[in-house]
Amino acid sequence: MSVPAINSPASSDHAEQFRKSGYTVLPQAISAESARLMATYALLQRNWPGYYQPEEMFRAAIGRYADAFSETLLLELKSTVEQATGLELLPCYSYLRIYGNGAILQQHLDRPSCEISTSLTLGFKAPALWPLCVTADGADKAVPLAPGDMLIYRGADVPHWREPFTGEYWVQTFLHYVEANGQYTDFKFDGRERIGPFDKLTMQRHFQRPASLGRNDTMATVGPDAPCPCGSGLRFRDCHGRKA
């Protein structure tokens, strides 16, 4: 897989924008060819019954927590994200999602283990790019991401959302980190013993997730058995909906 190095001037520009605005866009974080490879893999995984969890919260989406390929990207792209943000990071978890026609992502903030989040486009079948929107610098901004392009943002601080999807499918992976010298270091590996595929029935976390989705959250209310909108792959009642 081709992961291009970021030269010093570009890295400095990205880090400055990230410091100032809370987000930056990294074109071709992986090559378009590598993105297409993973998109094909993700689509083929639909043939494995139970591999993805339906996500009614997004109207038309399926997702997988800690998919092995996504976890690989989480590790392999850590240094790239560190250069682009100017921060030393710890990996938390990844999430692979396939959106279908009519899918929508309500405006929301993420939980602490998504302190430094990335959204990486892998592939799609649609008439046009489907922007990921953020509120930064006092304005709403639509960020188009082609295959291989990555948005890096402060997930718990930068509101983000997507308008209804009009294409057939859109494959996206999300890579989440925390600052190595920050206040959320306990969220390393998202409470797991290691990075890699996670079976919630046989494996345990060393903490229980917080019940808040973030400050000023505007995410619509979800039912207790619906997938948690944070992208964990767990039911809402077992994740952000857990009673304190």
Predicted regions and their residues:
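Non-heme Fe(II)/2-oxoglutarate
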Residues: 2-85
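A structural connector/turn signal
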Residues: 13, 138-140, 217, 225
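Conserved double-stranded beta-helix
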Residues: 57-58, 63, 73-132
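Catalytic core of non-heme Fe(II) oxygenases with the double-stranded beta-helix
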Residues: 101-157, 169-172, 178-194
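Short, cationic low-complexity segments
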Residues: 139-142, 193-214
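Short, Lys/Arg- and Gly-enriched loop/turn segments at beta-strand edges
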Residues: 159-166
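Acidic/negatively charged segments and metal-coordination signatures
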Residues: 203-244
